[in-house]
């Protein structure tokens, strides 16, 4: 019997928008050629404030075209207190933005689905065989979480790829546990291991809070190959298993869409960028997205490519006959009062103005029409 399966990612910061869009595009491509018996729904989980306040209508249109369902989520109960409590451990990672990954605890609330496959926005499935993951454990229970061992500490699992059974009681138990417990790493990976992974339950105080039925099912590493691995990676193993790798996970501060990633310019980073270029070219988004100001995560990272030469962009705009672009960049009217497409979706109009050197016609339907033609809404 076919299951209802959600393949989800979480967007907790606009810095990860390039990753989420590229991931959804790649999943759509692979699903067209995969033999999948289940009913698949691509879902984006996103905080209400982030979706309503920080995304422009063009971005919302593209998100809606790539994901069948956009699930607006509220902050967790006492989320700010939990973040503050976990601050010290999170500082050891030097990744303050990961505090919001605790929102993954909302995944167990998706009870409209029989199973949830969660993928971090900085992952890239490589082939249609990736979807075999859905057939590995047909008898999985709500007490079990399937994940790949973390390369930094293999007795713990990495939360970049998770297979789980939604359940409201489990969601409540996990979120209560999250409030009362300090995470090993200050983020989702630590707390999920403390909840599901018996190896992490050394403390009697922790043991009485979780069920003895909790279990971590170990997935093959090929379903979540992390990189860069800073000396941990086995080159012979990579060579031997290369044809069987199902998904690459770009961990750490620098992402394939980061400005300065020349040190990691290997095959898989190039593959991610090639997929991104394919996505943007299909609906002529180069002019817009190369000028997106995504802001910085609270590190030294700038999370987007250097914009191409302005003249190249102007020439490209002329070739594509993009009527929504105002080439007179010296006279951009930032105070133009124009109707936001977001109003059609009951989303509050963004207060920030586009930072691009180009001015977009917010009333024009040409942009939205091209997006819809390039990415028709998925049927499954």
From Swiss-Prot:
It catalyses: L-tyrosyl-[glycogenin] + UDP-alpha-D-glucose = alpha-D-glucosyl-L-tyrosyl-[glycogenin] + UDP + H(+); [1,4-alpha-D-glucosyl](n)-L-tyrosyl-[glycogenin] + UDP-alpha-D-glucose = [1,4-alpha-D-glucosyl](n+1)-L-tyrosyl-[glycogenin] + UDP + H(+). The keyword Cytoplasm applies. It comes from the Eukaryota. The record marks 104 as: Important for catalytic activity. Residues 331-355 are annotated as: Disordered. UDP binds at residues 10, 16, 95, 120-122, 249, 252, 255. Its cofactor is Mn(2+). Its main location: cytoplasm. It is an enzyme of class 2 (transferase). Disruption phenotype: Simultaneous knockout of GLG1 abolishes glycogen biosynthesis. Disulfide bonds: none annotated. It is found in: Cytoplasm; Vacuole. Pfam families: Glyco_transf_8. Its EC number is 2.4.1.186. One of its GO terms (biological process) is glycogen biosynthetic process. Keywords: Cytoplasm, Glycogen biosynthesis, Glycoprotein, Manganese, Metal-binding, Transferase, Vacuole. UDP-alpha-D-glucose binds at residues 10, 16, 95, 104, 120-122, 158-159, 185, 188-189, 252, 255. Residues 341-351 have a biased composition (Basic and acidic residues). Present with 981 molecules/cell in log phase SD medium. Interacts with glycogen synthase GSY2. This is Glycogenin-2. It comes from Saccharomyces cerevisiae (strain ATCC 204508 / S288c) (Baker's yeast). The lineage of its organism: Eukaryota, Fungi, Dikarya, Ascomycota, Saccharomycotina.
């Amino acid at each position: 019997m076919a299951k209802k399966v959600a393949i989800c990612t979480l967007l907790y910061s606009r810095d990860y928008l390039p990753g989420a869009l590229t991931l959804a595009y790649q999943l759509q491509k692979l699903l067209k050629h995969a033999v999948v018996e289940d009913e698949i729904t691509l879902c984006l989980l996103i905080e209400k404030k982030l979706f309503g306040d920080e995304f422009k209508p063009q971005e919302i249109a593209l998100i809606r075209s790539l994901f069948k369902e956009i699930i607006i989520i509220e902050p967790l109960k006492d989320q700010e207190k939990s973040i503050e409590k976990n601050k010290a451990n999170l500082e050891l990672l030097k990744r303050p933005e990961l505090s919001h990954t605790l929102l993954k605890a909302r995944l167990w609330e998706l009870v409209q689905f029989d199973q949830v496959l969660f993928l971090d926005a900085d992952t890239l499935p490589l082939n249609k065989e990736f979807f075999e993951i859905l057939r590995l454990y047909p008898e999985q229970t709500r007490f079990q979480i399937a994940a790949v061992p973390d390369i930094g500490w293999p007795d713990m699992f990495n939360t970049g790829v998770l297979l789980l059974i939604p359940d409201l009681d489990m969601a409540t138990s996990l979120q209560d546990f999250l409030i009362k417990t300090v995470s090993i790493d200050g983020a989702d990976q630590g707390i999920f291991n403390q909840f599901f992974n018996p190896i992490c339950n050394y403390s009697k105080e922790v043991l009485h809070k979780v069920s003895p039925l909790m279990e971590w099912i170990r997935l093959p590493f090929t379903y979540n190959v992390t990189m860069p691995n800073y000396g941990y990676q086995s080159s012979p193993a990579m060579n031997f298993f290369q044809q069987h790798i199902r998904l690459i996970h770009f961990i750490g501060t620098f992402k394939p869409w980061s400005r300065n990633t020349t040190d990691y310019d290997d095959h898989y980073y190039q593959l991610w960028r090639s997929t991104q270029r394919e996505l943007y070219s299909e609906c002529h988004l180069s002019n817009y997205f190369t000028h997106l100001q995504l802001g910085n995560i609270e590190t030294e990272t700038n999370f987007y490519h250097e914009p191409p030469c302005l003249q190249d962009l102007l020439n490209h705009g002329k070739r594509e006959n993009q009527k929504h672009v105002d080439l007179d960049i010296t006279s951009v009217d930032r105070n133009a009062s124009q109707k936001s497409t977001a109003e059609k979706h009951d989303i509050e109009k963004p207060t920030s103005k586009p930072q691009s050197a180009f001015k977009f016609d917010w009333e024009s339907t040409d942009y939205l029409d091209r997006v819809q033609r390039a990415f028709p809404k998925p049927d499954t």
